[in-house]
């Protein structure tokens, strides 16, 4: 993942000697996690019962209140220790753009949510994703020697996009 300033001693995130990370490294972890739909399925759930079909169901509420109160927020991880304060790595998708935010050492959960909301609002108000080349766009047709077909189309594996400020003209990029 390229984590350069992280050393996890335990899986709980609780304070331990030589246990640390940075906002940037936490964003790299989040960037990998959001690639997995099952993760977002869990982290976007505000409340649910665990062990529903047993004699002792357990009601669980997501400590990331933004999942319930800010449309589009679908994760990701809250945390608190005396040393780290209130932390939140959040993610939200809107208009074909996903943003990841990280706040650390916040005073309380309200400040944690408010600062995260400010960052998300800023990002979505200022920036947009521009598709330069659609995955269905033929770049070139190539002749196939001794193939079952005479030609094949060269297309991008996935959409090719760039991040643009909304206030700027969309870039006209040719290939």
Positions of PLM-derived features:
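Domain-terminus/edge residues, biased toward the C-terminal soluble/receptor-binding domains
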Residues: 3, 7, 15-175
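Short loop/turn motifs enriched for small/polar and acidic residues
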Residues: 11
